[in-house]
């Protein structure tokens, strides 16, 4: 397998940072708040709520959306406790939140922007969430927001020009069945490892809340808005190579370590793993739909998501030039964006078996 660059978001507070350009992800958390509350109310055993309650966010990035996610959970736990015991949770429960991401994540920005007046203690847990990062039975609820789509490696053969799996695109577009199969197999392996690790770390009866985006069954990545914009990124990098701004070899060897699985594929992987029961698989109505169809907003939003990863391979100036071209392509091909097929924004609730 070929190891990719570590995937992180652009840190800091600048106009290109994830901190400033992640309103789309935050909107899903806000839209899902009521369903998160319902899921915790229905599925969290009151016996788990002791005087110390621990929440863990895996793939927290540098904020601020992680704070929304964990606060949604804490609010729901307190509401359930008050309703079922009649006691004030502030008098009886201390909350701790564990923030996990790769060691090169911008934890400084994360901890400098912790919400004032928060009612929880906090700690950082650096490490890959594909592996164990905590002792057994360390927390009661885990959350992953837009992090349940990564693979740890590029599938073997994808970058080999002599292989039938050679993929000229930077992503898994879905149009080459062999490439899709290779990505799905790698995603399945990595997701199984992730679920195995969380099952060890979760308390018995604990919950995992997964929020993110997937494909509806039968829809190909490049038929969606996200896939189309990623195609624009690849085309822009090729344009820069043709102009001599970067090397064609760098473009040809640049592949993303993400796989937007179909809804049915996700369900099958979880069920075959056997460590969790799917308590809910909800379709969340996102207030911004897929993304706002504004070329500038699209370019800025995708730069926050992919910019650091692209910069690690090409350098920051090439990355910036590429996204300038992405905005141009989005404006020139706006009719194409209006014809894309919808993806799916989801909340998956898993209970540890």
Swiss-Prot record:
Record field: transmembrane: none
Keywords for the protein's UniProt record, in alphabetical order: Magnesium, Metal-binding, Methyltransferase, S-adenosyl-L-methionine, Transferase
Induction: Induced in the presence of the herbivory P.xylostella larvae.
Annotated SUPFAM superfamilies: S-adenosyl-L-methionine-dependent methyltransferases
Residue sites binding substrate per the record: 18, 21-25, 146-150, 301, 306
UniProt EC number: 2.1.1.-
A GO MF term: metal ion binding
Keyword Cell membrane listed: no
Annotated positions binding S-adenosyl-L-methionine: 18, 59-60, 65, 99-102, 128-130, 145-147
Leading EC class: transferase
Pfam entry (one): Methyltransf_7
Highest taxon above the source species: Eukaryota
Family that this chain belongs to: Belongs to the methyltransferase superfamily. SABATH family.
Name of the protein described by the UniProt record: Paraxanthine methyltransferase 2
Annotated organism of origin: Arabidopsis thaliana
